[in-house]
Amino acid sequence: MSGDIAKGKKAFVQKCAQCHTVEQGGKHKTGPNLWGLFGRKTGQAEGFSYTDANKSKGIIWSEETLMVYLENPKKYIPGTKMIFAGIKKKTERADLIAYLKSSTS
C-alpha cells in the first residue's frame, strides 16, 4: 500500500512533530530524531536514551514493521516510553510511512 506524502507530512506535524524531528542532524526531543530510520534496528539512534524494551526488541524498521508498530506502539514494544496511542486507519499509517520514507534519508 503506497501512501500520500503530503497527507503523511500533515499527519506527522499533527501527531509526531511534538516529540520527533526528521532532518539529518536534527535534535532529539522527547523522542529520537528519525533520520536514517529505515533499515535501522530499534533503539539505535545515537545519543538517545532508550528503554531496555526498545533496545532489546531487535527488529529492523521497514514499511512493514512501522505499519504494525504505528497501529499500537505499546502492544508492539511493551515498555516503550512512546506514549502515543497509535493510528488505527491503515491509509493514514501508509501516508505517514510514505512521508517518513521521503524525509528521513
Curated annotation (Swiss-Prot):
Signal peptide: none annotated. GO terms for molecular function: electron transfer activity; heme binding; metal ion binding. This is Cytochrome c-b. Belongs to the cytochrome c family. Binds 1 heme c group covalently per subunit. The keyword S-adenosyl-L-methionine does not apply. SUPFAM superfamilies: Cytochrome c. Heme c binds at residues 16, 19-20, 82. Keywords: Electron transport, Heme, Iron, Metal-binding, Mitochondrion, Respiratory chain, Transport.
